[in-house]
Amino acid sequence: MGYASIPSRGSGAPGETDYDGRAVTDLLSTLRDELAQIVDLGVAARVLEWDQLVMMPRGGATTRAEGLATVHRLAHELFVRDEIGELLDRLEPEVADLDPDSDDACLVAVTRRDWDKARRVPPALQGEMTKLGSEAMEAWAEARANDDYASFRPWLDRTLELKQRYIECFPATDDPYDVLLDDFEPGMHTDEVRRVFRRLEPALRELTAAAADDEPEPFLSGPYPRDAQHELSLEVARAFGAADEYFRLDPTVHPFCLSFATRDIRLTTRYAEDDLHGNSLFSTMHEVGHGLYEHGGDAALDRTPLATGCSSALHESQSRLWENVIGRSLPFWRWFYPRFRDAFANALADVPLERFHRAVNRPRPSFIRVDADETTYGLHIILRFQLEQELLFGGLSTADVPEAWNTRMEELVGVRPPNDRVGCLQDVHWSGGMFGYFPTYQLGNVLSAQIWERLVSDLPDAYERVEQGSFGEIYEWLREHLYRHGRKFTPAAMTERLVGGPIDPEPYLRYLADKNASLAAA
């Protein structure tokens, strides 16, 4: 595993900084070699996670949890070694003279941030969190299937206990929730999330209330045969740019995307034969957005910490852009509806395009976040953001979660879940310890509108391209301006480069208002 220590500084060739005869380029190569092994362990863990959620029989949960804990612990121990810190100490003054946007300068800066943070977390705690997350996911899946919150509650209690211990590793943080948010949105503060959500909540509630209270369209309940859903989902995924050579699509309970490398992307989806809103096409377009971000990264960054998306919010901006801004647009359905209607003729043969488009976009309060329309979706996220803070810091007992959830759903969304399966048990995130992730979904929605405005300023015929089923130029624009950079820049810096300013909810609210107005006029 490399070396035992970094030699003291020596004198190199004229004009070249050298450590005991080794050039800076050699030290960078050493750092890359060390990091590559750690990244490889992370990939191995993701393969195990993918298998657990897609292929593994339920009986394998305990041994899988132990195996994942071992892999994560080994990766953590390798990364937090003193030798990595010494390498960074030697390299930082040297790369200071490089272009700050260069791969080498960014690699050192990002590795330093990651290393400093990881050093605060004891390996034993890291292993406990990983093992518990794997076991709790299986407990959640069973509890959800049986509508049995009581059986999941002990797992949630234990998860919250470990999250509190994790937060205590970072005592200097202004707001303890910042620690959790930073895992997914580095550098963002909880106050900034509150600022955005304070602007969004009343506006989203007003937009929801203004929507006509239509009776559900009968064709929403299908039938939508699973095999046809799968074929159409693959067709659109390929059209967007998810080539079979680099992507695969599998069914799962809760759709997700995992990237093992820029050329190995795993997509998952779910199928609902009796609910158009749960049609696999929408979840597939969402996960393809994540996958395209990973696939569009510079392959030169593979096997480094830079080879992934910049942040969860920017990642979600891409899943929501491809799913909603493109995939729920009228131009998209002008292109794809003839094919879709033919595949589901039993449900849609007599349904005109405009009626179909209106049905899949109209605001409609509903129980399930992943099936929510664009307007009410943010209210689902605000609910989770509030409850997470109350669970961790506000005295909300896990015993009271179902009632707190249902009451808040009535207040924010306007519906009360009839059971916990479509209430507090619907999401996998808390079982996996992913506290702090939910806000990034709505931040991603906000960013998707900002990014689309910027894209259209360069490609004013973007929607015309969509209507022709031509997505290549859109993908290439996103790859050039966002995807290829991976994690080289902080989320704030990447957002500034991408849209010319910080995250701003106004373009998103304009987008929703314009869309809802056009739907009302249809």
Placement of each model-derived feature along the sequence:
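C-terminal, non-catalytic "cap/extension" segments appended to globular domains
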Residues: G21-L27, V43-R46, G59, T63, ...
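Secondary-structure capping and boundary motifs in well-ordered enzyme cores
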Residues: T63, L125-E128, W155-R158, V196, ...
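Contiguous, non-catalytic segments that form substrate-binding/exosite surfaces or channel walls
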Residues: M129-H277, N516
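A well-structured
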Residues: E16-P186, K488, E506, A513-A522
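Divalent metal-coordination and catalytic microenvironments
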Residues: L31, P171, H286, S319, ...
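N-terminal amphipathic/basic-hydrophobic helices that include classical n-h-c signal peptides
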Residues: M1-R22
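Post-HExxH zinc-binding segment in Zn-dependent metallohydrolases
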Residues: T308-L348
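Active-site recognition of the HExxH zinc-binding catalytic motif
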Residues: N279-D298, E316-R320
